[in-house]
């Protein structure tokens, strides 16, 4: 059994982190997550104390957020709490809490209960001061006789000394948890006392923002509550989490691991959540992963296979159509287990084993016709694709140049739009000598069809026309949402303009040494070597 929602004296719990570990061992738990309110101060201590003991301690946090005027809590599990971005964001957030607590001290003093802020902090060293601490302090000073009286007379939501906390939105919390490589969980949704419709709206919106899981097992839930939350999880593709919300003496009826006595959180829940912890490399192919001959070196093959064997995932993310993508991996004997690819510049995500589209964004037949009509006026070559072929009207110099690297059969038709009545993932526009002409064509597309279509350069000769919903960056976001991947566990690697949005979308954007200046400017890291010299080998070796 496990418990993925536990508090210590570093926030409003009464057990020290060492006492928590010892008690969890006494109760036979295999794992606990320390999720103190808005602080990670206890994590170093608890991780160190748990070393060598037969229990896993998961680094976590519980963020207090606000949604439409209501407190909503977001738990983060497996966060990289030493990540500089996370530390800076949390420090700024905590500083705002300190300011608020000092103002509450002034208000209490004005209402006849003198409270010195420095004395309060010394009384609870290392803790994030909450109203629970204020209530206990007021009792110690003899200003009130009970916690309830402290809230009713002074610090409750409608009491004279109350000040609202500096809050973030659930979206903010999900984003910062994801950027820190963590798993975001909507905590105890039943406690928010929302109507079914409003709770459904909350869960739907947070799932759209990248929420990974929901607390479906909790100390106070009824069997009906569990069924309801599991149904929401299934509806919105969320993983299940569970926790007691143990606080020690501050919630005396709730015990670690078992809540009110009947709570059971099986290890299998953690097994599923841990599947989110793999690292993903989304890599462009031509000019990034491949050399000029579209061949993997043996050394790069070994690095990629080792990366995958360690539980990580390579997702080819390319402008190529699917057949042109998978054929290149077949020719290199590099088809990987459970492989998925993002192709046609993010217009298609496909499962290689089943060849089943997971997500696709198509141009309509009417849009194809309109684009080709304008291309013909400008004297620009255009072809498209069906599932297996390059669809074109005639073979030209541009066709021969394109098929040097993309090995697919040619299907000749009189009218491309008529042939592709169900639409197409993209149109490929080629001019081998006149990029300004392609740029002018792209401008026309954006001015006349920009609400539906976009033009993206994959190199100086190729301009691809896609749905505005496509693009490699959007492809990565959709892939991560579908597969419960924290952005902080993603890398995106590229070299050209059509790679820039994915370089920006990933947790770490990588430009290879031969990339354009614009791609390098968008990246967090620039490789030492170019694509012809195994640019990404050090990345695969390091993860």
Predicted regions and their residues:
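An N-terminally biased module of ancient metal coordination in phosphate/nucleic-acid-related enzymes
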Residues: 1-70, 154-156, 168-175, 180-235, ...
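Substrate-recognition element of Asp-dependent hydrolases with the DxDx(T/V) motif
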Residues: 33-35, 183-190, 304-327, 345, ...
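Active-site phosphate-binding/coordination module
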Residues: 45, 62-98, 298-399
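Extended substrate/RNA-proximal surfaces in nucleic-acid metabolism proteins
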Residues: 51-204, 269, 368
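Conserved acidic, metal-coordinating active-site core of Asp-based
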Residues: 124-191, 374-493, 497
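Substrate-recognition/cap helix-loop segment adjacent to the acidic, metal-dependent catalytic center
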Residues: 197-210, 321-341, 437-454
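Non-catalytic pre-domain segments flanking phosphatase-related domains
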Residues: 275-285, 302-305, 309
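Mg2+-dependent phosphoryl-transfer enzymes with acidic/Ser/Thr/Gly-rich catalytic loops
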Residues: 277-280, 297, 463-543
